[in-house]
């Protein structure tokens, strides 16, 4: 598959642009141009042979394998499996950023999958509520994919379509009615193909790119599909909250994979200027986080504003979900260290000890996070993720990317399935307990919990059919779906579209027929994945044992067309029109639907199902309950009950003790029935015959709250406006403790759970440099606090990450982060961190 001559000017221009970008290295312009042009000639002269597919990359030659697909409308693909994109992160490189792979001299066979990153898939310890239904229902199949584990796991898989364009054109001219000759064929004259990099989900703890076969999507959409392995769990996201272990190694793996892709995908016929990242669940939140990181900037084929990728698709996951970021990483690092017998009093010794432990010993430890949260995941380190994702979005850090995102109709299925007798509906007592448990685990403001609990019950009760257990089950499913997925996705779409950046929103309303899910289930978390990958076109698989119908095949073709169109142009409607007559003669209703761009005003979204339509304001009432009313209820409660609770700031000569007798235990566990006994919390839903004073009180309270909020809004208009403007330039954060006190002190001493909305700005200004702050001097916006559990108040801030542990006097900076030499990968962390001034309005 040789690149056409018409692409010469395009690649020459890219080579020249690359020279301009790399001119800063000091090399003479003549030599730079000569080297880049020689490399361009090498790329153009390569030919991908279908019989013996051999590609020469920057690191050596690799041989792939040709695979035929079980569908006559799908051409074969060439698979390159187990391609290394980074060096093994083993030994002293554990808990360090990735380095480039070592070159190889012989031909490397890329015909089978590489080992997966270490993980422990044990039924009963998995966060089932955050995993796809097909994942948890087929653990035996998933386990077969993750048997071969190794820390040497940083590999990717490449799926390249190989259909001969000329042969297709001739056959379509001779037989226009042939199935392969569909209207607006997706072949585009053999030019460089768009690239789609899939990031797998799994709550940052489980999964592998090997699970997801990109062959059908690549063949049908005429795009190159890449799946990636990245470090998971403790090995990918352990953080001590300081320089000893900054965390986010899994995200840095993904960035390295994207850098490898941008520098090598041209050898496979791919376009380095049309790279789209997409993922589902935790993979979707990774996609969102990558759009917010300055490490995603920089592409050798263009100027730095183009980035390592240009478009992003976040399926059922954004950076604003409660489980997207770990706000208490140091606590879980100490819990793990205690379990394996490492010293927790010094973070440097802790990390050195963990580096020497067998990886299996670390992975096998059961470190349970607070419910609806994660123990080991991305952290706000002040570098890879410079600030809270919501703040970064408000500042426009992701405005340069085209973004498509959406949710499934019934994401929260697993939350409801875990309730007793959910198949027969949900009883009033179970409903009450589920809501109470939900509030207790997500909101750390005890003064207002009763009002919040009753407000949620009131809003999620269908008063026209409130005695029906099945109706109660439906509303409870909506509660979990709205809070954990819908509201964060809508908030993300609003923030992105506010900058005029192309934004597309969808709601997925279809799932395949299978006996593994209850009949009452809607499209659950992860149910869109088989349709994106084109599984219905090749029939059931072990992982997706569905009874696929022609409607499933049609819908999969529709979804793949939208996704690949977006990867090609940033517009899901172009260039390929929706036409599935090659499947059956039944009209495709998507042909008459134009997916309109999303804006905060209209909030238009595409309903993806058998009856597609463009609608507006998806679940607006419930979304605004979570984004507007609930944060203001907290604010109102704090204003009405506020008393000064500011902790006295001790002088620096006071040494914090590792523990106190009255300190709260650092371990967290799921709430028990004893803790949240519904009998101790009378509910209006527990019995049928009762007075309705509670509901009336809640109604009056909500109404009074809204009235009072309107009054407050006028009174505080200018104050909030000025505060918002100043917060963009100056956000208060905790002062650093001396030496290693961050890890010595319990979390409750470092950050107060009672973050009051008061005039603490004045307190910030009055704090002297020599003072040690034991609590958040300037509390974050309440909308940010909504994602944090009672024991997950954030330790990480942009300032705390720059700390260098120095419990030993005169110690030198430890665990220097590896840098990439030779001009490659030179934007990953450097040994001596210094404050990074990231642009808030990249253009």
From Swiss-Prot:
Disulfide pairings: 117-153, 172-181, 342-353, 512-546
Region (Disordered): 647-688, 822-843
Tissue distribution: Expressed in brain, almost exclusively in neurons, and spinal cord. Detected in pancreas islet beta cells.
Top-rank taxon, per record: Eukaryota
Cell membrane found in the keyword field: yes
Example of a GO biological process term: modulation of chemical synaptic transmission
Subcellular location: Cell membrane; Postsynaptic density; Synaptic cleft; Synaptic cell membrane
Assembly description: Interacts with neurexins NRXN1, NRXN2 and NRXN3. Interaction with neurexins is mediated by heparan sulfate glycan modification on neurexin. Interacts with NLGN3. Interacts (via its C-terminus) with DLG4/PSD-95 (via PDZ domain 3). Interacts with GOPC. Interacts with AIP1 and PDZRN3.
Protein name: Neuroligin-1
């Amino acid at each position: 598959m040789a690149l056409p001559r018409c692409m010469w000017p395009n690649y020459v221009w890219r080579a020249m642009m690359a020279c301009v970008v790399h001119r800063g290295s000091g090399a003479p312009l003549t030599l730079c141009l000569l080297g880049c042009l020689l490399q361009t000639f090498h790329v153009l002269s390569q030919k991908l042979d279908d019989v013996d597919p051999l590609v020469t990359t920057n690191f050596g030659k690799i041989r792939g394998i040709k695979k035929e697909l079980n569908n006559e409308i799908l051409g074969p693909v060439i698979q390159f499996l187990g391609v290394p994109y980074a060096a093994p992160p083993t030994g002293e490189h554990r808990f360090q950023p990735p380095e480039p792979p070592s070159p190889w001299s012989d031909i490397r066979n890329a015909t089978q999958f590489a080992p997966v990153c270490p993980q422990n898939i044990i039924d009963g310890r998995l966060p089932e509520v955050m995993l796809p239904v097909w994942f948890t229902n087929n653990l035996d199949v998933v386990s077969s994919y993750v048997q071969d584990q190794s820390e040497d796991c940083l590999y990717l898989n490449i799926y390249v379509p190989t259909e001969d364009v000329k042969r297709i054109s001739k056959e379509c001219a001779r037989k226009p009615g042939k199935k392969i000759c569909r209207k607006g064929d997706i072949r585009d004259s053999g030019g460089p193909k768009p690239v789609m990099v899939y990031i797998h989900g799994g709550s940052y703890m489980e999964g592998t790119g090997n699970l997801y076969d990109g062959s059908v999507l690549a063949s049908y959409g005429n795009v190159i599909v890449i799946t990636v392995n990245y470090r998971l769990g403790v090995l990918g996201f352990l953080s001590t909250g300081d320089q000893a272990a900054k965390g986010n190694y899994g995200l840095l793996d993904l960035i390295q994979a994207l850098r490898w892709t941008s520098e090598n995908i041209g050898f496979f016929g791919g376009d380095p200027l049309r790279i789209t990242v997409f993922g589902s669940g935790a993979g979707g939140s990774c996609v969102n986080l990558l759009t917010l990181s300055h490490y995603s900037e920089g592409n050798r084929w263009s100027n730095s504003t183009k980035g390592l990728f240009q478009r992003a698709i976040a399926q059922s996951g954004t950076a604003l979900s409660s489980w997207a970021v770990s706000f208490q990483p140091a606590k879980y690092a100490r819990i793990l260290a205690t379990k394996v017998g490492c010293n927790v009093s010094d973070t440097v010794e802790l990390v050195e000890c963990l580096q020497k432990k067998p990886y299996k010993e670390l992975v096998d430890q059961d470190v349970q996070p607070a419910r609806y949260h994660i123990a080991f995941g991305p952290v706000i380190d002040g570098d890879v993720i410079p600030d809270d994702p919501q703040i970064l979005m408000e500042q426009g850090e992701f405005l340069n990317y085209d973004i498509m995102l959406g949710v499934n109709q019934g994401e929260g299925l697993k939350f409801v399935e875990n309730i007793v007798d959910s198949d027969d509906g949900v009883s009033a007592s179970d409903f009450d307990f589920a809501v109470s448990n939900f509030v207790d685990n997500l909101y750390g403001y005890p003064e207002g919990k009763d009002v919040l609990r009753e407000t949620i019950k009131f809003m999620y009760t269908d008063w026209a059919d409130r005695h029906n257990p099945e109706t109660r089950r439906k509303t409870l499913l909506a509660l979990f779906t709205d809070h954990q997925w819908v509201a964060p996705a809508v908030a993300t779409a609003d923030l992105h579209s506010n900058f005029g950046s192309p934004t597309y929103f969808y709601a997925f309303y279809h799932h395949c027929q299978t006996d593994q899910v209850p009949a009452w289930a809607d499209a659950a978390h992860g149910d869109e994945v088989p349709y994106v990958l084109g599984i219905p076109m090749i029939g059931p698989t072990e992982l997706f044992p569905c009874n696929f119908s022609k409607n499933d095949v049609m819908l999969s073709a529709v979804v793949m067309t939208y996704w690949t169109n977006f990867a090609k142009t940033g517009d899901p409607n172009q260039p390929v029109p929706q036409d599935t007559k090659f499947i059956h003669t039944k009209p495709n209703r998507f042909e008459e639907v134009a997916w309109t761009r999303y804006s905060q005003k209209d909030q238009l979204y595409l309903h993806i199902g058998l009856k597609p339509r463009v609608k507006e304001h998806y679940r607006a009432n419930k979304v605004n309950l979570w984004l507007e009313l609930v944060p203001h209820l907290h604010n109102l409660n704090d204003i009405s009950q506020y008393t000064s609770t500011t902790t006295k700031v001790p002088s620096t000569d006071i040494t914090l003790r590792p523990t106190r007798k009255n300190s709260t235990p650092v371990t967290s566990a799921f709430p028990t029935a004893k803790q949240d006994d519904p009998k101790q919390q009378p509910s209006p839903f527990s019995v049928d015959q009762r007075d309705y004073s509670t509901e009336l009180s809640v109604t009056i309270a909500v109404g009074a709250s809204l009235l009072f909020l309107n009054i407050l809004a006028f009174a505080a208009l200018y104050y909030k406006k000025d505060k918002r403007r100043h917060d963009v330039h100056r956000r208060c954060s905790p002062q650093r403790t001396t030496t290693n006190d961050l890890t010595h002190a319990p979390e409750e001493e470092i950050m107060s759970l009672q973050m009051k909305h008061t005039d603490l700005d004045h307190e910030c200004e009055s704090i002297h440099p020599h003072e040690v702050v034991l609590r958040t001097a300037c509390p974050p916006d309440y909308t940010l606090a909504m994602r944090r559990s009672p024991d997950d108040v954030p330790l990480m801030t942009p300032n705390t990450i720059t700390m260098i542990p120095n419990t030993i006097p005169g110690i030198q900076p430890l665990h220097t982060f590896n840098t990439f030499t030779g001009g490659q990968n030179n934007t990953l962390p450097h040994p001596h961190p210094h404050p990074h001034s990231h642009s808030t309005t990249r253009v």
